[in-house]
Amino acid sequence: MKFLSSLVVLGLSAQALASPYVDHQATKDQRDVNVFKQVLQDINLDVQKFDQDITQYQGGDPTVLLADSDAIIKTTEEGIQRIGPQPPLSVTEALALVGPVQGVNKLIMKAVDHLIEKKGPLVGGGYGPQVKDSLERQAHAASKLSELVSSKVPSPLAPISKQLSDQVAQALQKGIQAFSISARQATKVKREATKVQRDISAFKKVIQNISLAVNKFNVDIERYVGGDASHLLADGNVLIKATLDGVQSLQNEPPLSSMEALALVGPVQDLSNQILLAIQNLIDKKEPLVQAGFGGKVENNLRQQEEAAQKLSELVSTKVPHELADISRQLSDGIAAGIKKGIDAFAGTGPAPTTSSTPEASTAPAPSTPPQTPEDTLVPATSTPAPGPAPTAPDSSMVWPTSTTASPDVQPTITSSGTSVPAAPTGGNSSPAVPAFTGAASANQVSGAVGLAAGLLAVLAF
């Protein structure tokens, strides 16, 4: 029925906001949508009886089928009276309607298909016009209720609501058409309707595999009381693999129609709820996980899950009809928000990065030749001196001399090759011999500690 499709799109849109904040409004949702739920339940019961009686029908008087149809019409009209006074629905409030709407929607499609299969005995008995008239009255009542429900939908969702209402209304129209055309044409309509289930089977399989992985992850989280959490990381890796495998398997799937996308709402809703529950349970176990040294590992695993989920989301968005693109994005954002909540909870809980007091260059192989710009490196004179007085060498502690010497002063210089050689004597100057290197005003200003540091840097430089 048309109004059911409106509820379907509401449910899909509500699912798009399936985030950690939904639980906060759970009580309000149950109160506001209770009337809608009750109408759905009543229609579900009537359609279920209609379908059962159709299945059992073998020919002859179809009074029971016509009575079932009248009951559906009556329940629909009563639904109009009950829903009329209700305030407009928010997107979040529609979340609780997704499951019931999906159940009724599938049941209506099945009942119409079963009715078409009974066209032979119904038309053969002369009851074709009566069945057609009954279906037309159902469609009229459904149209009125659809218009009412559409008035309860937020305006941004109105175009999608109308489209989905028209598509679901085609279920009844298909039945009307089947009793107005040949059996061959009716069979063709039936065959085209079956295509929906075939096209989405790959998507359902991916969702199912991920759901199984999330469920195992959640069960192990609930059982965890402390200590080694390697099995939780393994569960996370299985979940990541299932997600990436899904990306691979869906690459070549054709785009989804609106109705095909709607058929995935129920499974996606269940998966989203599973993910949110698992993340919350994981956060509840934060203290023992961090104490056991697994905080950083959990954070890293969640980041990998987030990356895999993003890849799947990007792929699925290319398969969704344009008119559902925004809702698809909101849906993926809701799931991503759940994972991000876990990442934020464990952020910074891992061990601090290990810092080394030795520069990274010290771990590299020694260069075959010294650097070409040695002026920034403190290097003692170590090369063979040129003819002339030998330069004053540093002692074993690498502390440059600071006392006055009677020998001629020699100031070592650094050649372009980086080799330290003594300069020519400066003469009978009585000032101390001071090694020349950039950054030191004079040897008298270099303490023993600084000299030691200079020596160490010189060694490290080579």
Swiss-Prot record:
One Pfam family cited in the UniProt record for this chain: HsbA
GO biological process, one term: fungal-type cell wall organization
Free-text biotechnology note from the record: An enzyme-linked immunosorbent assay (ELISA) with antibodies against Mp1 protein as well as Mp1 antigen-based ELISA can be used to detect infections caused by P.marneffei (penicilliosis).
Region of interest (Disordered), residue spans: 346-429
The keyword Phosphoprotein is assigned to this record: no
Sequence ranges of Low complexity compositional bias: 347-366
Family the UniProt entry places it in: Belongs to the cell wall mannoprotein 1 family.
The protein's name: Cell wall mannoprotein 1
Organism: Talaromyces marneffei (Penicillium marneffei)
Upper lineage: Eukaryota, Fungi, Dikarya, Ascomycota, Pezizomycotina
Gene label: MP1
